[in-house]
């Protein structure tokens, strides 16, 4: 599982380049969430070619775009399956069971939630 906080086009470009250097043409089960106030289009344009499937998950930050709205954006950039999940836990489980390498990206809030989950601390609500 790869965790990367790419939340803007510059970081997404570096992520995509590094993914290709490390994994070649391998596709990712992409666990994704992004803040509504970020350049989501710019990020999606760069990371969409990495996706074998998308797993859109909610996040504790109120700034995160809802999974339904995110699905509409992702489908404009990608023709692979886009699956919306009710929880981070179900999204991670589905991604792990996909047969693809798992890539979690799009938001530092998302990475914080994932790291808290892995540490057994759960997810903490944030006002940001």
Provide a role label for each language-model segment.
Residues 19, 23, 74, 118-122:
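Active-site catalytic pocket residues across diverse enzymes, especially alpha/beta-hydrolases
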Residues 107:
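Active-site-proximal loop/hinge segments that shape catalytic or ion-binding/gating pockets
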Residues 1-53:
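Nucleotide phosphate-binding/pyrophosphate-handling subdomain across enzymes
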Residues 60-63, 124-128:
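Short, flexible loop segments at boundaries between secondary-structure elements
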Residues 110-112:
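Short, active-site-adjacent cap segments at secondary-structure transitions
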Residues 1, 44-101:
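C-terminal helical cap/extension that packs against the catalytic core
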């Amino acid at each position: 599982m790869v965790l990367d906080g790419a939340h803007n086009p510059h970081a997404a470009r570096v992520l995509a380049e590094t993914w290709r250097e490390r994994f070649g043409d391998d596709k990712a089960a992409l666990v994704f969430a992004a803040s509504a106030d970020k350049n989501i289009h710019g990020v999606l344009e760069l990371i969409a070619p990495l996706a074998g499937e998308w797993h859109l998950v909610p996040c504790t930050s109120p700034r995160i775009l809802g999974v339904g709205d995110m699905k509409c954006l992702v489908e404009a950039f990608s023709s692979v399956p886009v699956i919306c999940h009710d929880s981070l836990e179900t999204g991670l489980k589905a991604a792990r069971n996909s047969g693809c390498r798992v890539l979690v990206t799009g938001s530092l809030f998302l990475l914080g939630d994932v790291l808290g989950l892995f540490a057994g601390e759960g997810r903490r609500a944030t006002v940001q």
